[in-house]
Amino acid sequence: NIEDFIELIEENSQEMKIQKLIKEDLSFMADYLAEPYEEYICFSNYPIGDKIADFVVLTSRSKMKVCIVEVKGADFKTVKANHYQGLNVHMNDAITQLKNHMEYINRNYSSFRTQIHEDKDKAINEEYSGNYLVGPRKNLLVDPQKDIDVKYIAIGGVEREDKSIEESHEIVKCKPADNLEIASWNSFVRKLDEYHGHHPVQ
């Protein structure tokens, strides 16, 4: 449950621990990214070319949104103590991984779009061989003939208590592309908290 997740972040857990919990319950990542509510498919360790993405979430309607996620631990500050220094090295690693995925998808867009729609159908039909979760709606109302909307998200580290405004400016400044987002685990938990506040578990 979300309390277990919050505990991991408060304990400044390392990446492996956080990854393990999310892989055991992919709804954490899916709830963070799904729009509309409950309409998603989430994969872990998803192959993109010869690389592997930590998580991929498929969501939206008509034009499918493909969210490609790399995560790091909660055992460092997302932005360095001197905010002129930019992001922590672990976040830069995540961004490099995402840029590799971005380059592959941009070069092989058509085949990737075909692959992701095929894997979406396999997951819905319970035929996908990897670790995945299909949302409670059990389907995605997306059109395989339309382009896909690919977003890249790096999640890692925790916020410094006194630097939220400078930190948000720093994160925006460090974004290498409009479709690449950077988030701390604090912002991840805030969004999940808000989500579960609006959609309490029945």
Residue ranges and their predicted role:
Residues 1-202:
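Charged, terminal alpha-helix-loop-beta segments
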